[in-house]
């Protein structure tokens, strides 16, 4: 593999590990020319369905967009990067399991919301507010009330 720093073609694998969700192999590599280290990931290439946007245009499924939108919703929340990767892997699996060649962006948004709901309720509300285009505070209150009904009561934290 070519070194991203000096473009030399001779690199050695220093360490290999299976990722937490088992969907990738993480490799630490060292360049024999410049001695710098870098990380690579080996994943199975999947034929995921094309995404049909609201305007009818089609685009390739882009894992990075899903990760970026989840990271934005999870900003400053105590959720590990591995948990985000695992959630995106579950979304990809669900898309593959349908066997469909296309998926509507609305369906993809719902899958993301379902994963965020399991990871962090604050991130779920953040994402839902943008995805569902909340117009006023009452829509936030409705989502929060939905959570209160669905989950057992927890003692509130005082700051």
Swiss-Prot record:
Ranges where the ATP-cone domain occurs? 49-139
Q: Which GO terms describe its biological process?
A: negative regulation of DNA-templated transcription
Output the Gene Ontology terms for molecular function. Answer: ATP binding; DNA binding; zinc ion binding
State the InterPro entries in the record: ATP-cone_dom, NrdR-like_N, RNR_NrdR-like
Pfam families, alphabetized: ATP-cone, Zn_ribbon_NrdR
Q: Does the keyword Zinc apply?
A: yes
Q: Kindly list the ranges of residues that form unnamed zinc fingers according to the record.
A: 3-34
Q: Which cofactor does it need?
A: Zn(2+)
Q: How is the cofactor bound?
A: Binds 1 zinc ion.
Q: Which UniProt keywords apply?
A: ATP-binding, DNA-binding, Metal-binding, Nucleotide-binding, Repressor, Transcription, Transcription regulation, Zinc, Zinc-finger
* S-S pairs: none
Q: Which domain of life is it from?
A: Bacteria
Function according to Swiss-Prot or TrEMBL: Negatively regulates transcription of bacterial ribonucleotide reductase nrd genes and operons by binding to NrdR-boxes.
Family indicated by similarity: Belongs to the NrdR family.
Name of protein: Transcriptional repressor NrdR
Q: What broad taxonomic lineage does this protein's source fall under?
A: Bacteria, Pseudomonadati, Pseudomonadota, Betaproteobacteria, Burkholderiales
